[in-house]
Amino acid sequence: MLSPQRALLCNLNHIHLQHVSLGLHLSRRPELQEGPLSTPPPPGDTGGKESRGPCSGTLVDANSNSPAVPCRCCQEHGPGLENRQDPSQEEEGAASPSDPGCSSSLSSCSDLSPDESPVSVYLRDLPGDEDAHPQPSIIPLEQGSPLASAGPGTCSPDSFCCSPDSCSGASSSPDPGLDSNCNALTTCQDVPSPGLEEEDERAEQDLPTSELLEADDGKIDAGKTEPSWKINPIWKIDTEKTKAEWKTTENNNTGWKNNGNVNSSWKSEPEKFDSGWKTNTRITDSGSKTDAGKIDGGWRSDVSEEPVPHRTITSFHELAQKRKRGPGLPLVPQAKKDRSDWLIVFSPDTELPPSGSPGGSSAPPREVTTFKELRSRSRAPAPPVPPRDPPVGWALVPPRPPPPPVPPRRKKNRPGLQPIAEGQSEEGRAVSPAAGEEAPAAKEPGAQAGLEVRSSWSFAGVPGAQRLWMAEAQSGTGQLQEQKKGLLIAVSVSVDKIISHFGAARNLVQKAQLGDSRLSPDVGHLVLTTLCPALHALVADGLKPFRKDLITGQRRSSPWSVVEASVKPGSSTRSLGTLYSQVSRLAPLSSSRSRFHAFILGLLNTKQLELWFSSLQEDAGLLSLLYLPTGFFSLARGGCPSLSTELLLLLQPLSVLTFHLDLLFEHHHHLPLGPPQAPAPPGPPPALQQTMQAMLHFGGRLAQSLRGTSKEAASDPSDSPNLPTPGSWWEQLTQASRVYASGGTEGFPLSRWAPGRHGTAAEEGAQERPLPTDEMAPGRGLWLGRLFGVPGGPAENENGALKSRRPSSWLPPTVSVLALVKRGAPPEMPSPQELEASAPRMVQTHRAVRALCDHTAARPDQLSFRRGEVLRVITTVDEDWLRCGRDGMEGLVPVGYTSLVL
């Protein structure tokens, strides 16, 4: 049962075939065109174009049928038409869709079928005597055009809708010489024409060898004498398959072959259709059985039992062209035409090009280029010299910066990597011959076949700039991991040293003693010199240099800031918070590094070192806030979790050991963990020392000259043993200014500037100070002040006193040191300090200090005293100690414990 659409198409094709048959019949019989009825010529004239039959002498219509007598084509027509020759064979030529006059219309009814090729006309070849005429020039069309089924004894065009039984019954009529329209069918000797075989061989050349059917029970040997049947479909399809995946496989012998036997046989191979066509063929003897081929939803082709030595192939296209040209125009003999105009359009998309004829027959190469062949050429391995020029705009060299298109060249494949080809279609990549040739190279031992690294030219197009960016990223990641492994190695070495230190213990008591830093300082040294620096570097790795702060804007980050941020109030970190508070209250630990070390010592004491590191790694927000993505803890949290696991495994043995470490061990033992102390700079060379001494001596003489003592200093230096030294000059300058005198050492002049001259500084000052007050030259002092830019008179009042200072104590005073030097000491109002210093030596023995607290001497050279006692000052040792006496006893007294008695 046909669908409505296919039934409509069958009816339309049937009507069209009737019109074509009528037109062909009228073109062969011009006398019938004068009227609807005509008298046929005498029956003896066999060379005419009239039909011959039992209706001779009666009026017939255009179909040679009597209007009074119903036509019984299978019973009443005589056998005389068997030897009748159709003269139209001489003027019929094989038409191809590629003919210049008809290439625009492939078939007059091709638009009736939306998805199939047009149906061929069924004509029946009748057996008869050999005709004197050679094989007609009608040859099968190219494989893309509709062909005649060439089945012997096919039915009339209305067989589209008939059943196999009716067709077989019609084919077994006693008079098979006429068709359903009472038209004589031409007979011809079955002589294979060279053109036919050549065309068949060319058709065979297009068949891919991968689709040939294997030998089965339906395959027939060409040497059999018994006639066999070949079932040709209603229409033929080009062997180059379309997108709908129609696949037709034919044997290499598709035509009529003459094997030297009188009764020629038909040789057939079962044809396979991927889109649902199934043709069932069976080998039968002549006159035995009829085969029916099922074609796509009920379209059938019926085969007669009788093999005939001749076939006439006619297509819709040929009939339409003869009808257009008219009966008077002879057909031009067909030559081999270029069918690229319609072959390219209908060329299917196949995976592989045709690989030659299966039967071994060699045919000349076709000059037609199809899309399939172009695709096959592009997939084939390129020869050393390219067979054709590359398209315009393409380049076989690395592209320059201006042109954006990238050449479709093969990328360089590293050993062991899959080659990647660009510029090809997906199916081309799948079956690329070049890829198949290079595939064995990827299976070499030791090759990394699992990686695919794509290399591309740089944007600048410079060959030297070609880099594997992914390989670089992998190498960078590898270097980063190696760096982190180095941090873990340092931790591992330190842990091994600590464990080896405890390995000397034989019992738990000895282990406890070895873990106590007071009993065994070596463990403290080991922890501070090996483990603490390793953990400090680990925590500081990848740490951001600054941390945002609400008040100061940013604070410098350090491992101790990580400790501060990680210790939060909570149940799990309560003990850690207690330890953090304890370390923070240790005043001697001023640097963040020493505090971090003390925190590590406390973690070892409480066996929480592993706990703190695990809690630090679990806090993702803290890590993102404090660390860069390349830091150790960031990598351990993200891409390399094995780092954190390995760190915890390394620290796990320390949780078993017992430690009693002093948190101030570093402060007490002064370990050289900080920056080493800079060595004392070497002293100046002797020449420089002499120069400096000479300059200082000149300064002393200048001061003496300003104070009127130049006469005394003018004497020979060897004669005066009490020559003022550079220290005495500076002492005099300090005494004159009274600015550099310390409050704690007030009354003990020049103790800061002459620490090595404990007993002689005050004596020399006492001997030299009275001289400037007595013999001071006012002009000399004014000259020195003007030399240094000190203002003159406005700095003094009428009585010589200084002006009062400004009310604000924040403002600088109006008088300077050089102004005091210029003015000198006023003679009418000497200060009490100057009076005390200018007193004779016996007066200085009465200078005393009062004790502020009780003090017990710690050494024999110190003096013990009680609070409130008055001690006699003998001399000043340095800025911290005084030599005092009490009740006939002398000793050292701290300056801070006394106050000066005025």
Curated annotation (Swiss-Prot):
Q: Which Pfam families match?
A: RUN, SH3_9
* Pro residues: bias regions: 381-390, 398-407
Q: Enumerate the UniProt keywords alphabetically.
A: Cytoplasm, Cytoplasmic vesicle, Cytoskeleton, Endosome, Golgi apparatus, Microtubule, Nucleus, Phosphoprotein, SH3 domain, Synapse, Ubl conjugation
**In what residue span(s) does the RUN domain sit?**
522-666
Region: Interaction with IKBKG, residue numbers: 606-672
Q: Which GO terms describe its biological process?
A: protein polyubiquitination
Under Gene Ontology molecular function, one entry of this record is: actin binding
- InterPro entries under this entry? Run_dom, Run_dom_sf, RUN_RUSC1, RUSC1_2, SH3-like_dom_sf, SH3_domain
Among SMART domains, the record links this protein to: RUN, SH3
Name the residue ranges with Basic and acidic residues bias.
291-309
Q: Cellular component terms, GO, for this chain's entry? A: cytoplasmic vesicle; cytosol; early endosome; Golgi apparatus; microtubule; microtubule cytoskeleton; nucleus; postsynaptic density
Comp. bias (Polar residues): 277-289
User: Which parts of this chain are annotated as the region Interaction with TRAF6?
Assistant: 470-605
The task this protein performs is described as: Associates with the adapter-like complex 4 (AP-4) and may therefore play a role in vesicular trafficking of proteins at the trans-Golgi network. Signaling adapter which plays a role in neuronal differentiation. Involved in regulation of NGF-dependent neurite outgrowth. May play a role in neuronal vesicular trafficking, specifically involving pre-synaptic membrane proteins. Seems to be involved in signaling pathways that are regulated by the prolonged activation of MAPK. Can regulate the polyubiquitination of IKBKG and thus may be involved in regulation of the NF-kappa-B pathway.
Specify the protein name: AP-4 complex accessory subunit RUSC1
Organism source for this protein? Homo sapiens
Higher taxonomy = Eukaryota, Metazoa, Chordata, Craniata, Vertebrata
